[in-house]
């Protein structure tokens, strides 16, 4: 398992975790969340389990550019840290967004450069990294 955490992860007691993946060479990072369990649709009358364990042990994030860098530089060039675990989906999603806002993932830049400090290109599925910088007042139409 590549995840580092101040204590042992506890999938039986928690729904998922918020994580930080950091490129050790550039300090560029990614903040995301991962569920320990996924619901399984049961056939009527079945006694099969209602959830199955996710791929959290080997999971390396969902950002395309992060995954490309991991493939190019190797997994050892990255630090995989669990920030905190949460007992339900609502708390998990809330704190994922909380940490993304806390770290200012959409507008932070690497020190001394204009390169984004985070691999995150959007948060909450609604707010995206700007494609261009806002330079002037919007044009007023009559």
PLM region spans:
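Structure-specific nucleic-acid interaction/processing domains
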Residues: 1-141
């Amino acid at each position: 398992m590549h995840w580092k955490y101040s204590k042992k992860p506890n999938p039986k007691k928690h729904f998922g975790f918020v994580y930080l993946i950091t490129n050790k060479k550039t300090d560029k990072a990614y903040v995301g969340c991962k569920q320990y369990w996924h619901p399984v649709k049961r056939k009527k009358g079945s006694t099969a389990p209602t959830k199955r364990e996710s791929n959290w042990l080997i999971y390396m994030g969902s950002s395309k550019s992060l995954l490309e860098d991991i493939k190019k530089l190797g997994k050892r060039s990255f630090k995989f840290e669990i920030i905190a675990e949460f007992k339900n989906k609502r708390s998990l999603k809330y704190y994922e967004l909380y940490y993304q806002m806390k770290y200012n993932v959409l507008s932070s830049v690497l020190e001394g450069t204009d390169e984004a400090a985070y691999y995150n290109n959007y948060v909450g599925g609604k707010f995206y990294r700007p494609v261009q910088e806002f330079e002037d007042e919007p044009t007023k139409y009559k």
